[in-house]
Amino acid sequence: MEGSSKKIKITIVTDDGKTNMLSEEKNGQNIIVTHDSSMTLMSTLLKNELVHGSFCGGRGDCGRCRVQFIRGVMIPTMLERSVMTAEELRQGYRLACLTRPKDDCVIRLSFAEEKKIAIISEMKEMSEFDDQLSQQNEQSVNQTTCVSDTCVIEKKASATDKDVETVIAVDLGTTTIAMQLLEIGTGRILDTYCAMNPQRRYGSDVISRIRASVEGKRKELQQMVLFVLKEGVMKFRRRCRSIQGMCIAGNTTMVHLLMGYDVLSLGRHPFTPVEIGLQVYEDSDWEFKVWIAPGINAFVGGDIVAGLYALGLLSDSSSIEHNDRCGELDKGLADIAGKSARLLIDLGTNGEMAITDGRRMIVTATAAGPAFEGGAGAGIVGSDMIAKVAELLQTGVLDETGLLKEPWFSEGISVGEPAVRLYNKDIRALQMAKAAVRAGVEILWKRMGQPPIDQVYLAGGFGYYLDVEAAFRIGLLPVSMRGKVTAAGNTSLAGAYRIGCDLLDGTTDKGQLEKRLSFIESINLAEQEEFNALYVRYIDLR
């Protein structure tokens, strides 16, 4: 009841140097905050800007916002009992997003440490598709390691760069936002600006943000992203006077939040987007045109479309069958048309996949949950999680069904540096995600007619850091793909650049681009009869 709330004092102990908070006062002295007893502890921590945000949006199912009560511990909730061990509960550990302190208390924050986020800001060499991009990126994929809110790659501006005609490419991700200033025609990178997506304050996944938007945070979520974009543009303007345009590629939810749309329809069946085509964003602060890359549906968005565009896979290949050409078949696809297939996989909270044989393209997506971003409470990035599980499997500590042997079955096992504990539930989350992705890959391949796979592209940071052999060892990818896997880097960012340039010079337009997308077949895995059987088949680690 509203009248039953009261103001209490919470003392946060910071004398051990282990507290994972943002305050500059965290070393050497305790912090005292005022708390409304009707609110969750997490709301007070966020209000006082002591933590970045809630990993799961306050649902309590990730188990990562742990605090230890030194005095004034609350009775654990049922959900807290399910995500923490009996010993942890006895030691006073609770979840900040669930607990509501009623009296003065003393706590120590024990949040899962934020991993350094590697923002992949270039695409690997793809000379068979684009000679210009390959010349620019032939050495390596550029990356920025970020654990704070913003990361900037500083480059000295030369006098000759001031009047170069440029385009801004943006990869609007759920976790990070990467921006690049590139020279039109050559693809030369003049500057880069990266930031954590500030919307993570309301959760690390799109469902949490949809809920926050529906509950009244729509304008705030929009302004959070606009602030980052305007900071990046302001930096780029100091570098170059002639910015011709900006193209933003992001998943469907991120784009809807940027545009200020009502996202309620994205959170419930039949998951219908407000707008999925190529859009123009109007802002009086920007004198240049801003395009939003088109998506395919609620689950396969503009980031994947941009990736397909960058790799040369989004050709007008379907017009071979429809006798309705919009342009020439891309060089890379002309060589394989009807003979073999290429597969693009982008793994994160959602696993988006696309397959093409040069004539047809089929796309799908599967919910991977937090497994590829780290086990629910483990605090391990997804690529490391796969490597660790493969190692445990090889050493016999873990069996193929995903069970840890004793004594680790009961106590979990310490892995990595710094050490974190893996429990059976963390491994199970990875198994479920792995089974869903593997089943999705097989369904796409069968729907395409089971052609030989010529190339597999892994997009984004996950693919860049993935130990491919470990992925084969746990059965994430079929062994028939061994030797055919390429970490393609940030294909979303590269595609945003290419789309922006092509729109500027008239190589493509809204009608042509959307016509290409109209030929793409999209399948819902949940509606495929064989999905459940394949899911069960691939749940084991083999």
Regions from the PLM with identified roles:
Residues K6-K9, Y93, A112-K124, Q132-L133, ...:
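Acidic, glycine/GT-rich loop-and beta-edge segments that sit at the periphery of enzyme/chaperone cores
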Residues H35-G63, I70-A96:
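Immediate flanking context of iron-sulfur cluster ligation sites
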Residues E125, C146-E165, F288-R342:
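Conserved phosphate-binding catalytic cores of ATP/NTP-utilizing and phosphoryl-transfer enzymes
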Residues M179, G187-D205, L264-V280, D316-S318, ...:
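Glycine-rich phosphate-binding loop of actin/hexokinase-like ATP-binding domains
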Residues T192-L226, K289-V290, G295-L311, G358-E400, ...:
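Glycine-rich phosphate-binding loop plus the immediately following alpha-helix
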Residues D357, Q455-Y457, G461-R516:
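Catalytic phosphate/nucleotide-handling subdomain of diverse soluble enzymes
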